[in-house]
């Protein structure tokens, strides 16, 4: 019966409203998390579990789309490992299902429907009759959706023990906030208890939400507490007006008790009630959903050499393809974050870094580069998954049949394909199963390939009539060129787009360094079937046409398979795929035979195995170790002087020890990830690092969110990076008070105990750091940091260009350069 808490009460059906979908575009102030007791002055914390049980749904309902899963489905596995440290990030899945399937790495995803995020508001008042069984009055009951009346409903009176506690209590002035789960149900009850003039008729504001949102309740407590405070002030206002009316009519005395049950708040105050419900439905609940559904970036430890290699490779590719040797966009942006925003974004919760771009791939690559410079980084150990060695006879026979690959160079291997094997490749990519059947490629009907040596060179037409025997189980993703390399009829079009088809490109294809790009080679995702539709950009972009079909689409028509949507030309312009013979486009080597792995590019992070969900990292091992050290401590664990006081009949033995906790341990992130995320379809105020589409709408959302942040702070700051116009702006917004109508000027005007009003004005300051290829006026410290970043990148380039250097020496030098960048401000 308790499992039906979200069902509406029959007596309140007259005030029911139809279900409304939450609006992700709503923004809520992003402030520190705390739980407070209203009058006792104590502080309470609410700890969420790593994953919790989802709401059980008896029958399927209308599906409610989420923000993250569609985006993650179209991000390559390599980029997932860069951003999140894992290929699989579970969304809203029951913890029992995860445990039964071997932890967090399962491939099943539980659907999210509108009932999962339903909520219920309960306002209950004590009647002041402690000896009476019916000591509670139902003041207000609201739920988001209409549920069938045939289902069992739970009455607010049945929740009195959860809301008010034991009916036998002492007469005190207890006012507090409580968070607890309802037994035998998937619901969380958040309650604030207070009283107006008499302690015998306490009032409770209760919010029931799905238990699936429990892990983010503590982190989003400021938004929930703000809504509870707003509702409490509203109810106190109702009681105050009623008391004034009784005083005017002569019906009020000192012993009179003002009760909400004597006021029909739905009839007399419909506007205030509507504001209360809409604030919860369009601000608080969407905020909880955003924190629960949108995955956060994982910041690798600075001593993890595999990550450092990939990070430098990403910087080299960006400079070669995007910036060129003279632009200096990326070094300046990195210096701005190192010298300023790295500390600001951690100390000032209202500061943000937003990348504006119409290309999700480019924005995510830049997010990966910038996030490595931010704190707090993960300090724990990273598990490296061992590669499975296939020693069965089938694998041996497959290796023997593929010996002809050894004598082929990589550039030639990237031009060999088979249209007859495309169907088998598609099936094997979805199943990841290997078989022993070998199929010879057929040269009849094979499409033409183009060899492209440099971005400014017209592709040379070349036929691929060579036949080669390959296993049908092999992934041929490495031979599928992106849509940018198409038929020779439009080669001149690609020549112009390669040179400068995007405003501000500044000939980024010139002066390339092939040795660096060959040192690391990217690995696109093997996902197919579903296609990601690129967001429409605003006016001003050049219109591009792609009339000719890509190789994958042409071969798909021959094999009667559903083609995958090819990347758009604008994506190639902003960040070209590394698919030329100089740096072949190789698929995920984890699905290739062992012999092919030896000649293919091995992504350094491909074996990273991190158990996590959208918000947290699994720390079960550390928790078990800490629990054992607490239960069975050793003298070495104490690490300080201690004293044992023997117990007696009243208490047990007591051990006292000096508590000397250093800053490194206090700042060590163990579970919760920082509020840094990926490219989103809309700007989200809850995250401090993100990317969103470029345009006036996004900039308007950012400005509005900064104004909302000023409700809880006097200063907010945002770094806006526009990849379309190559623009870096530092926008600051502060609130200055011009008058004071209250003697206490140090008190926050939005504090719940402060009723005074103060006039203030908003002042905005915009500083252009980089605009239209020109560097703005920089401070001396920022100029020094820019020079340091440029010299560090040059040193890293020379390090990776030196093929004769020992691998261990390269690792140590790369770690040293990266550490100097991360700790630049501390060292300086």
UniProtKB/Swiss-Prot annotation:
Keyword Oxidoreductase: no
Gene name of this polypeptide: LST4
Keywords for the protein's UniProt record, in alphabetical order: Amino-acid transport, Phosphoprotein, Protein transport, Transport
Domain of life of the organism encoding this protein: Eukaryota
Organism: Saccharomyces cerevisiae (strain ATCC 204508 / S288c) (Baker's yeast)
Compositionally biased spans, kind Polar residues: 392-405
Family membership noted in the UniProt record: Belongs to the LST4 family.
Biased composition (Low complexity): 543-562
Region (Disordered): 1-25, 392-411, 423-444, 538-569
Mutant lacking the gene: phenotype: Sensitive to high hydrostatic pressure (mechanical stress).
Alphabetized InterPro entries for the sequence: DENN_FNIP1/2, LST4_longin
Protein name: Protein LST4
């Amino acid at each position: 019966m308790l499992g039906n808490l979200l069902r509406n009460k029959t007596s309140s059906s007259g005030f029911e409203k139809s279900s409304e979908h939450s609006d992700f575009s709503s923004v809520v102030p992003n402030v520190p998390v705390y739980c407070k007791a209203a009058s006792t002055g104590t502080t309470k914390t609410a700890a969420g579990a790593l994953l919790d049980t989802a709401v059980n749904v008896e029958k399927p309902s209308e599906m409610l789309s989420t923000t993250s899963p569609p985006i993650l489905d179209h991000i390559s596995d390599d980029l997932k490992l860069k951003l999140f440290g894992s290929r699989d990030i579970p969304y809203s899945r029951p913890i029992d299902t995860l445990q039964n399937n071997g932890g967090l790495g399962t491939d099943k995803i539980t659907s999210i429907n509108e009932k999962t995020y339903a909520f219920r508001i309960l306002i209950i008042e004590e009647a002041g009759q402690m000896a009476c069984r019916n000591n509670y009055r139902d003041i207000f009951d609201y739920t988001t959706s209409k549920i069938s009346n045939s289902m069992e409903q739970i009455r607010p009176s049945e929740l009195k023990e959860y809301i008010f506690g034991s009916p036998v209590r002492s007469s005190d002035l207890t006012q507090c906030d409580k968070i607890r789960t309802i037994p035998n149900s998937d619901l969380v009850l958040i309650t604030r208890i207070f009283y107006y003039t008499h302690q015998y008729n306490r009032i409770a504001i209760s919010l029931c939400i799905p238990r699936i949102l429990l892990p983010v309740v503590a982190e989003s407590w400021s938004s929930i507490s703000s809504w509870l405070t707003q509702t409490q002030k509203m109810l106190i206002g109702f009681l105050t007006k009623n008391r004034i009316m009784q005083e005017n009519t002569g019906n009020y005395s000192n012993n009179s008790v003002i009760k909400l049950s004597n006021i029909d708040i739905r009839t007399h105050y419909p506007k205030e009630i509507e504001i209360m419900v809409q604030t919860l439905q369009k601000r608080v609940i969407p905020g909880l959903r955003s924190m629960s559904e949108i995955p956060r970036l994982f910041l690798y430890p600075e001593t993890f050499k595999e990550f450092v290699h990939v990070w430098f490779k990403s910087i080299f590719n960006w400079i070669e393809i995007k910036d060129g040797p003279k632009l200096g966009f990326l070094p300046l942006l990195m210096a701005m974050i190192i010298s300023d925003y790295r500390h600001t974004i951690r100390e000032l919760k209202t500061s943000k870094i937003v990348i504006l771009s119409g290309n999700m791939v480019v924005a995510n690559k830049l997010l990966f580069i910038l996030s490595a410079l931010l704190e707090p980084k993960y300090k724990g150990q990273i598990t490296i998954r061992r590669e499975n060695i296939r020693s069965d006879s089938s694998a041996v026979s497959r290796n023997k049949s593929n010996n002809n690959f050894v004598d082929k160079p990589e550039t030639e291997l990237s031009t060999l394909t088979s249209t007859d094997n495309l169907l088998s490749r598609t099936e094997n990519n979805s199943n990841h199963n290997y078989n022993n059947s070998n199929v010879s490629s057929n040269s009849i009907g094979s499409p033409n390939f183009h060899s492209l040596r440099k971005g400014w060179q017209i592709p040379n037409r070349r036929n691929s009539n060579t036949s080669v025997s390959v296993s049908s189980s092999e992934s041929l993703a490495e031979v599928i060129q992106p849509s940018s390399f198409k038929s020779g009829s439009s080669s001149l079009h690609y020549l112009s787009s390669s040179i400068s088809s995007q405003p501000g490109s500044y000939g980024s294809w010139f002066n390339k360094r092939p040795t660096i790009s060959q040192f690391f080679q990217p690995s696109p995702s093997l996902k197919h079937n579903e296609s990601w539709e690129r967001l429409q950009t605003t006016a001003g972009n050049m219109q591009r046409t792609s009339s000719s079909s890509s190789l994958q689409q042409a071969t798909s028509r021959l094999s009667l398979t559903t083609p995958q949507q090819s990347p758009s030309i604008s994506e190639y312009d902003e960040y070209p795929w590394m698919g030329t013979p100089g740096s072949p486009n190789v698929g995920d080597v984890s699905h290739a035979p062992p012999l092919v792995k030896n000649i293919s590019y091995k992504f350094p992070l491909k074996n990273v195995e991190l158990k996590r969900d959208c918000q947290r990292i699994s720390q079960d091992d550390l928790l078990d170790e800490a629990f054992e050290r607490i239960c069975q401590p050793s003298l070495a664990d104490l690490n300080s002087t201690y004293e044992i006081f023997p117990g007696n009949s009243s208490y047990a033995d007591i051990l006292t020890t000096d508590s000397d906790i250093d800053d490194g341990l206090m700042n060590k992130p163990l579970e919760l990830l920082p509020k840094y995320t990926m490219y989103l379809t809309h700007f989200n105020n809850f995250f401090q690092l993100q990317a969103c589409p470029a345009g006036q709408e996004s900039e308007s959302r950012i400005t509005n969110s900064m104004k909302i942040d000023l409700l809880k702070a006097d200063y907010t700051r945002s770094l806006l990076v526009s990849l379309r116009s190559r623009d870096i702006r530092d926008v600051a917004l502060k609130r200055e008070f011009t008058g004071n109508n209250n003697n206490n000027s140090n008190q926050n005007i939005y504090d719940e105990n402060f009723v005074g009003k103060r006039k203030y004005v908003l002042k905005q300051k915009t500083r252009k750091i980089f605009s239209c290829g020109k560097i703005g006026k920089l401070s001396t410290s920022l100029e020094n940091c820019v020079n340091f970043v440029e010299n560090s990148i040059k040193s890293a380039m020379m390090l990776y260009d030196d093929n004769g250097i020992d691998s261990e020496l390269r690792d140590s030098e790369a770690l040293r350069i990266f550490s100097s960048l991360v700790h630049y401000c501390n060292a300086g």
